[in-house]
């Protein structure tokens, strides 16, 4: 398992902050510019890492759950270049809507596969998401979900973040540790 490349949170005074760990970036597949842009984008979208959006359960669309308002996690396997610098793809507001808007982009790159766009509350290859499911057993309310492929890249990233018990996500999934 690789170390987490970065995370963002808020301190006890509600001041948002983010970290990128250069040593971990060297070990994994993402370069530091992708990790930095990932955390910067998510700091802008949810500075204190405390927002949730109601949406369908990934496997039972009739059941509603609360998804973390993370702008990069679902597309964390995708990046693009700006003047030769790799940066993270990110979600747009339409991704957080339960209704599909014909012709709308739900992520900045606007694709999952050629000719196929990313559906609301879905995951691109290499991505992951976390959601709160009130029907889940106690201690398992926070539930991970990975892309429809093998999910290994997203799983490795999420496992690293969960192991980092100092992050808000780590504290949510390991209360009392």
Feature roles, as predicted:
Residues 2-13, 20-26, 30, 47-177:
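Metalloprotease/metallohydrolase-associated module, dominated by Zn2+-dependent proteases
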Residues 39-49:
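Acidic, glycine-rich loop-and-strand cores that form catalytic or ligand-binding grooves
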Residues 29-41:
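Short alpha-helix carrying the canonical HExxH Zn2+-binding catalytic motif
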């Amino acid at each position: 398992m690789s170390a987490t490349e970065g995370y963002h949170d808020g301190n006890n005074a509600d001041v948002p902050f983010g970290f990128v760990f250069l040593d971990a970036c060297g070990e994994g597949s993402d370069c530091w510019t992708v990790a930095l842009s990932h955390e910067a984008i998510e700091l802008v979208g949810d500075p204190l890492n405390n927002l949730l959006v109601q949406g369908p359960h990934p496997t039972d669309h009739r059941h509603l759950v609360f998804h973390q308002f993370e702008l990069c996690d679902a597309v964390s396997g995708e990046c693009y270049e700006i003047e030769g610098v790799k940066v993270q793809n990110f979600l747009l507001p339409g991704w957080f809507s339960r209704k599909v808007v014909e012709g709308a982009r739900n992520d900045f790159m606007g694709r999952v596969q050629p000719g196929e766009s990313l559906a609301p509350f879905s995951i691109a290859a290499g991505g992951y998401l976390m959601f709160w499911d009130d029907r889940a057993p106690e201690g398992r309310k926070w539930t991970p979900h990975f892309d429809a492929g093998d999910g290994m890249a997203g799983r490795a990233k999420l496992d690293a973040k969960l192991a980092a018990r100092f992050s808000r996500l780590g504290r949510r999934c390991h209360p009392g540790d």
